[in-house]
């Protein structure tokens, strides 16, 4: 389906996906520090699920495990767009993932 999302296979061993997850956490931390909100002390653990979507570049939807300052493992949803021809990537969104019941 053009414009639809595609699930990424073998996420835990996909180096590019794991690097995008690490970038997402680092960028979130950097943005939080510039806002001086007191947040932004997450430590990347791993991407546990990912989907891609072709837009003006490739948009990645990542489910990321990160460790909080207090040592708790939490799951976050991140959106990153990569435009390889411009050598650019941008974090579009980063928030706690909804808790599955």
Curated annotation (Swiss-Prot):
Keywords: Protease inhibitor, Thiol protease inhibitor. One of its GO terms (molecular function) is cysteine-type endopeptidase inhibitor activity. The keyword Nucleotide-binding does not apply. It comes from the Eukaryota. InterPro entries: Cystatin_dom, Cystatin_sf, Prot_inh_cystat_CS. It holds the Pfam family SQAPI. PANTHER family: CYSTEINE PROTEINASE INHIBITOR 2. This is Cysteine proteinase inhibitor B.
